[in-house]
Amino acid sequence: MVSENFSNFDAFLACKNLSKTELLNKVLNSNSVFQYEAARKLQFFQYNEIRDIIKDILLASRYSRHREIAVFILGQIQVQLNDVELNEILSILVYSICHDKSISVKSSAIFSLGHLFRHYNLGEKVFYEIEKDINLIWDINRYSIILAVAFSSAYFPHRNYIKKYLIKNLNSKKSQIISWILYLLREKRYKSKSIELLLINRLNQTNINSYTYNEIIAFLISINSMKVIPYIENILLTQNRVDNEIYLALKK
């Protein structure tokens, strides 16, 4: 095993000129830093060059980390996929979401699904075809799943149940979840009185010095909320400064 003390840059140098067989060996036998660097390098091969590695070795592995890396690779292959390849990968990701018992594999597959919807501008037709198959994701209350769903939902077609899911998770105590959901709400231009009131309530429970506090205020500014004005005034009075996130929102 490679020492855990190696950095991302060490891994980059070590994997820079390796063949696909050597990269596979890194994925199978290294620590996570080297595994993911090797995986990123494998993404620069054509799909038909790494298809057997993905399907017959990584996805067939009893180790969840190998399966997680397999679906990670599939989401961001850098060489353009043809329709047959894209459909095959979509099927693999949906299967992993539905049937793999590992939460880390499921969340990685959801992230990859989002990347494909974004990169290939997949829309209503493709989502309709997989929608029922992935409906279990809305009921899994696990941190990594919620993050993955929040990211990917930015590139899925509009659905009221997705909007409700996101609003529900604005109550999360995890700052990263709040960040992703605010990003998605902004991207989708979702706004409503219920979102506004929920976020105002969150401000009352959030440390004024936290990044989350500033993100919430920036979002409220972006939807032209008048209720946020006292909170901005309070920042100016108590801190004599405006965070970059808020400043950029005010400029728009």
Region annotations inferred by a language model:
Residues 2-14, 29-46, 65-84, 104-121, ...:
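Structural detector for internal amphipathic alpha-helices that build alpha-solenoid repeat scaffolds
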Residues 13-26, 47-58, 80-97, 119-135, ...:
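Amphipathic alpha-helical scaffolding segments comprising HEAT/armadillo-like alpha-solenoid repeats
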Residues 25-33, 59-65, 98-102, 135-141, ...:
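Short coil turns that connect the paired helices of HEAT/ARM alpha-solenoid repeats
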